[in-house]
Amino acid sequence: MVNPGPPGLIAGLLLAALSLSSVDGTKALGFVGHGYNMTVSQGHEAKLNCSLQGMEEPEIQWLKDGVPVQSADQMYIPVDEDHWISFLSLKNVERPDAGRYWCEAEHSGRKSVSDAIWVMVEGVPYFTLEPKDLSVTPNSPFNMTCAAVGPPEPLVIFWWVGDSPLGKSESSPSVLQIPGIRERTAFSCEAHNAKGVSSSRTAIVEVKGLPYPPFNVTISKVTGSTATVTWSPGFNSFSLIKSCTIQVQSLHGNREMYSRLTSVPPFAVVLDDLQPLTNHSVRVQCTNEMGASPFSEWITFNTKEKVPQLIPQNVHMTKTDSCLLLDWEDVDPDKEGYNILGFKVQWEQENTTQGELFVQENQANLTKWNPEKDLTIRICIANAAGCGPWSEFLLAGSKEEAGKQRHPHTRMSWVPMVLGILTALVTVVAMTLIFLRKGRKETRFGNMLGSMLGRGGPVIQFTAARSFNRRGPEVMEATLDSIGISDELKSKLKDVLIQQQQFTLGRTLGKGEFGSVREAQLKMEDDTMQKVAVKMLKAEIFCSSDIEEFLREAAFMKEFDHPNVCKLIGVSLRSRTKGRLPVPMVILPFMKHGDLHTFLLMSRIGEEPIALPIQTLVRFMIDICSGMEYLSSKNFIHRDLATRNCMLNEDMTVCVADFGLSKKIYSGDYYRQGCASKLPVKWLALESLADNVYTVHSDVWAFGVTLWEIVTRGQTPYAGVENSEIYSYLTAGNRLKQPPDCLDELYEMMCQCWITEPKRRPSFVDLKRRLEAIWGRLSILSASHDQLYVNLGETCGAAAAVSGLHSAFCKEEDYCAGPSQTCGTSAITSDYRYIVNPGCLREGNEWSSSAQNGEARGLLHEEEEEEEEEEMQEEQVVITL
């Protein structure tokens, strides 16, 4: 109970109530008194009351703007047995407390409503629109807008440019018109009213300029006629880079130069039609709306020698008793840059190569051959890269003086023909005998049935009650046609369908309520094995609609092609017994270093904690933002963006993964609201929590929470707040607090991602631009580049990422401990996610044994193995750090 007001107020109300009851002894149910207006200063206490008569022990409900007030600061005072006064106390009044209040009571189906009490909250001005960060061209006009509200009114706006006030006051809203600037400038505004002054955020206006020259120009995959050029763009000077120009200079004979324009990203291009065995030089420049950057430095490379694509022409042969003379049309040694060294002559007898001869002239003399047998000869042109296409076979008969060109394999041997005819005849005879025997076969009722049929009598009919097949249940063929999905989805998945015989399932990497992720070895076209991750739905909890939804999201992933978005390798179907739907599986790249959340967590609380530089964290943010920018450009809504769903690639770049699939696989961070599906509540935007609405703006909200996770190195957002309380917590105006050591610019960016109105949140394009600007300034200030080294030593396998990372960030040997020779372990009993790292998973030994077992069993596991998988979920997982 709280004190509802001064004793004099209570006494006066009691006296008024007593006087009313004395005037009329018969009291009808109803509220007495009149409504009134109340003005309260922000931060002070307000006390409201209403008086009800005509009911014993009433239930009086306070309402604000039609919504029941859930507050413990309410108190009842009885005047007599059927006359009561209710008090409502509002402590530390804020602007959301302003509104219309009244009381309601119900008795015998009749509702009574009091007059309204209007509460107005006065305080310092509140900004509804603040200046925003901009990037502008030099000396171009632009506007800045600032708006604030009271009460009390009126209020005025003052503008500041840097640390200097403009001195002119304007009413709200105020639009500041700037004719143009030439350098980076800060703008802010102040709002004044009778209660005080409020200051807006500081908006930074950057001046666009020419981009910096590209760097890290690299030449790879060089052949005789092609080469791949990749590069890193320089700082874009606050204007998006749209295209790059690659200049190629050839030093073949005379200097030849040509340029090639390509759109970006990706920052890579394949050069073709290059001269073989030639020195080339390459340089790159990139262009934004302000113009082109300076060129990068020249990078020199040599194309490889190309196999000649020429065939010897006009081959002639002269046969004598002791030798065979060959000659053909000569070829220029330097023709088309092939650097021809000579000719290779090969001869065969009875379909077996008898010898080879290399000559530099356009003639050859063969002496080592059997003149009693047919001889076939062919010739090719050769250089250091190899032998070109062979000429047609030249046939020299055993008694001919000169040959004529024909292919030796066109001769048809009579032996295979006879064998084929005999095989066909035997097959036809066997099939005829089988059908005849089957037609004459009768049951023990055959004679009786035959006589009845002859007389036109009734025929005995029966149906088998059950099958006594000893071979076990028949396996249903797993095809796209057998799972009941739409034709449109079939056509999308047809070219990425992988047969289940092409890969072998290994150990389980993670399990959840709706499915699991398993390691696997995929057999490639060149017979090599590639390690992949396989996601599959749990066998007993899905129907055909679940399969279609699962595979439809996989079809979306098929179209993705971006370095920061996890790309689909393929889909597969696991066969099951007839009558049961196949298990759908999605095949994804195996990310050696696991998910970003575990990496950040281990860097903070692992056995060897490391301090991640802010440049590295911002680089992670840029990677995620680039991936989300790409997804939003494809009109794809992620719905579950978080560090746990961002994977670390082998080169430590971040890839956005789990495109909506994770919402039905993992359940640890999800909350079921009523009977709806489980949701990642602490990452959801307000509109998603309230109306189940998902847009690119709700992904921006989740991106803000993801930034907070990265800055805090994997801490849980809204710690101490229950999932069921998140909506009330956010609607009350609360947000995640600024973490220690967090840049003000980063936290301002997070807060803008959490604006209540979705359309006022920044886009991923704008967020990426601002993050790149922050990273550019940090890179300039830093004395060293932000490189991330991962120690992949054999002691701990791929799992030595933490110790390697720890060493990489130490600048002096005297201040760094040497790498640990042993691996610590940390037992994690809860459900972990794909793929836990940094931490040692002992991939080498465990997988080899797992793969061998998989080879023996094949892909398909029998039904009893599903129970073993359930038991594995209960076991403790040991992660080596």
Curated annotation (Swiss-Prot):
Q: Where does ATP bind?
A: L509, G510, K511, G512, E513, F514, G515, S516, V517, K535
Catalytic site: D640 (proton acceptor)
Q: Which residues lie on this side of the membrane: Cytoplasmic?
A: 436-881
Q: Which organism is it from?
A: Xenopus tropicalis (Western clawed frog)
Q: Which gene name does the record give?
A: tyro3
One of the entry's Gene Ontology molecular-function terms is: transmembrane receptor protein tyrosine kinase activity
Question: Domain Ig-like C2-type: where?
Answer: 29-114, 125-206
Query: Posttranslational modification, per the record?
Result: Tyrosine phosphorylated upon receptor stimulation.
- What this protein is called in its record is Tyrosine-protein kinase receptor TYRO3
The free-text function statement in the UniProt record for this protein reads: May be involved in cell adhesion processes, particularly in the central nervous system.
Region annotation Disordered: residue ranges? 846-881
Q: Which family does it belong to?
A: Belongs to the protein kinase superfamily. Tyr protein kinase family. AXL/UFO subfamily.
The record describes its membrane topology as: Single-pass type I membrane protein
Taxonomy of the source species: Eukaryota, Metazoa, Chordata, Craniata, Vertebrata
Q: Where in the cell is it found?
A: Cell membrane
